[in-house]
Amino acid sequence: MDPLGPAKPQWSWRCCLTTLLFQLLVAVCFFSYLRVSRDDPTVYPNGSHFPDSTGTPAHSIPLILLWTWPFNKPIALPRCSEMVPGTADCNITADRKVYPQADAVIVHHREVMYNPSAQLPRSPRRQGQRWIWFSMESPSNCRHLEALDGYFNLTMSYRSDSDIFTPYGWLQPWSGQPVHPPLNLSAKTELVAWAVSNWGPNSARVRYYQSLQAHLKVDVYGRSHKPLPQGTMMETLSRYKFYLAFENSLHPDYITEKLWRNALEAWAVPVVLGPSRSNYERFLPPDAFIHVDDFQSPKDLARYLQELDKDHARYLSYFRWRETLRPRFFSWALAFCKACWKLQEESRYQTRSIAAWFT
């Protein structure tokens, strides 16, 4: 017998077995890869899960990139399904590496307004990516708006005609009985306060204050005035019956935290200088505030406040609305979640002229 005879079929059997094992190994690796690709997307440093960088997202959850943190101050990012009822969650991140895949980019104007061409995203945006212009400042404090024309698809601001309306505050009906304690009038030991950071000696609000204080004592807090240590504002302002909620510029819907937080949270009656009374009444009951336009002069306003100081029943009438309504306040997290809701609610793609609209 040829000693090599039986060797040939033995070698062939081993070869077939090796080939089958190799093919089985390749198949296992392939299906394992598919499973990992499906179940374990790329994890970015903030812990959010996003698709690969092909430029065409395969995700169903909207991915929102915050191009900058507002005023460069990071916040805890929310679960939008918990903040805005009826809204599905979005992936919200400030990690610019996800820019090619982002469904939307929120640009806070303050951080880009001094040099928009250098500070806006430079890489080409992917098809369908929506840019959201975001500002809570008035047009008087927003520079270089014309440089933004042609870039943005949605607006987000305090203006009620924004695509995404983010007011500084609003009133919400109580779901049951009011849970706050009644106003402790005996704790209101002072009359009028004003906290101001940007003085602006030639501004309308400072000129009005100077005329008012000739007839009425007003305690002014802030830079170059009475100190107001951090964390003591509400405790301090709650001692006052009235608060001057004077805006730094006069524009439609520009009703800021000066009214919503400084006055209403301190349970002080707001004395407002800003847009028209009718504009305020779109957001507040007419007896929830005092408007300077209701008086022919600061002297007349001073006389009225002094009358209310002595007439407890009339003063307390400015709090009747609290029996059915409660103030709610703006937050950055809520604004981002409103953008999340809008992106899922409406897919329309448009280009806005920011400069023509925001005046």
From Swiss-Prot:
Family (UniProt): Belongs to the glycosyltransferase 10 family.
Gene3D superfamilies found in the cross-reference section: Glycosyl transferase family 10, C-terminal domain (3.40.50.11660)
Role description: Catalyzes the transfer of L-fucose, from a guanosine diphosphate-beta-L-fucose, to the N-acetyl glucosamine (GlcNAc) of a distal alpha2,3 sialylated lactosamine unit of a glycoprotein- or glycolipid-linked sialopolylactosamines chain or of a distal or internal lactosamine unit of a neutral glycoprotein- or glycolipid-linked polylactosamines chain through an alpha-1,3 glycosidic linkage and participates in surface expression of the sialyl Lewis X (sLe(x)), Lewis X (Le(x)) and non sialylated VIM2 determinants.
EC number: 2.4.1.152
Organism annotation: Pan troglodytes (Chimpanzee)
Name by which UniProt lists this protein: 4-galactosyl-N-acetylglucosaminide 3-alpha-L-fucosyltransferase FUT6
Main location group: Golgi
Keyword terms, alphabetized: Glycoprotein, Glycosyltransferase, Golgi apparatus, Lipid metabolism, Membrane, Secreted, Signal-anchor, Transferase, Transmembrane, Transmembrane helix
Entry's Gene Ontology cellular component terms: extracellular region; Golgi apparatus; Golgi cisterna membrane
Example of a GO MF term: 4-galactosyl-N-acetylglucosaminide 3-alpha-L-fucosyltransferase activity
InterPro entries: Glyco_tran_10_C, Glyco_tran_10_N, Glyco_trans_10, GT10-like_C_sf
Region (determines site-specific fucosylation): 73-112
Residues exposed to the Lumenal side: 35-359
Subunit structure as annotated in this protein's UniProt entry: Homodimer and monomer. Monomer (secreted form).
A Gene Ontology BP annotation from the UniProt entry: protein O-linked glycosylation
Domain of life assignment: Eukaryota
Membrane topology: Single-pass type II membrane protein
Catalyses which reaction(s): a beta-D-galactosyl-(1->4)-N-acetyl-beta-D-glucosaminyl derivative + GDP-beta-L-fucose = a beta-D-galactosyl-(1->4)-[alpha-L-fucosyl-(1->3)]-N-acetyl-beta-D-glucosaminyl derivative + GDP + H(+); an N-acetyl-alpha-neuraminyl-(2->3)-beta-D-galactosyl-(1->4)-N-acetyl-beta-D-glucosaminyl derivative + GDP-beta-L-fucose = an alpha-Neu5Ac-(2->3)-beta-D-Gal-(1->4)-[alpha-L-Fuc-(1->3)]-beta-D-GlcNAc derivative + GDP + H(+); an alpha-Neu5Ac-(2->3)-beta-D-Gal-(1->4)-beta-D-GlcNAc-(1->3)-beta-D-Gal-(1->4)-[alpha-L-Fuc-(1->3)]-beta-D-GlcNAc derivative + GDP-beta-L-fucose = an alpha-Neu5Ac-(2->3)-beta-D-Gal-(1->4)-[alpha-L-Fuc-(1->3)]-beta-D-GlcNAc-(1->3)-beta-D-Gal-(1->4)-[alpha-L-Fuc-(1->3)]-beta-D-GlcNAc derivative + GDP + H(+); a neolactoside nLc6Cer + GDP-beta-L-fucose = beta-D-Gal-(1->4)-[alpha-L-Fuc-(1->3)]-beta-D-GlcNAc-(1->3)-beta-D-Gal-(1->4)-beta-D-GlcNAc-(1->3)-beta-D-Gal-(1->4)-beta-D-Glc-(1<->1')-Cer + GDP + H(+)
Residues that carry a glycan: 46, 91, 153, 184
Subcellular location: Golgi apparatus, Golgi stack membrane; Golgi apparatus; Secreted
